[in-house]
Amino acid sequence: QAVRQMMTAARTAPKGKGIDIIEVAMVTDEDIKRLSEELVIMSGETGLKFFLRDADNILQAEAIMIAGTRQQVQGLNCAHCGFPTCVEKPKTVPCAINSVDLGIAVGSACATASDLRLDTRVMFSAGMAAQRLGMLGDCKCVMAIPVSASSKNPFFDRKTKTE
């Protein structure tokens, strides 16, 4: 129920130009294990040990909200992406407005979790794993918010993996 409220907050968050390109979903049970396994694979591929730490850490979540953005040029020619016009921006470079929209949606979801006194942490690592697993279709930038209701937030004061 609480994660659904977070998803609603992300869904209804303000969007640039009023265009909704945000996708949200809830990850539970076996899919959390799949995310964890993907993080282990990612650590092996990159050598980044914090992926291992996060692989263990998300197993303590009761659920994980994932949010991502479909890439869609907004046609503002604002140059915020680093290119003078939307036409000149390579397809592989995200529209800055898309990223801002995702940040606002994630912030809104976290504010809702805080209002409900839930423990969370925004994780790009678990978001990347969800993206690699296609959990949000063709979204190109995905963030994950593991959620727990416990006496101490399990997503902080984490130990770095050394092996």
How would you describe each model-predicted region?
Residues 1-163:
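Acidic, surface-exposed loops and disordered segments
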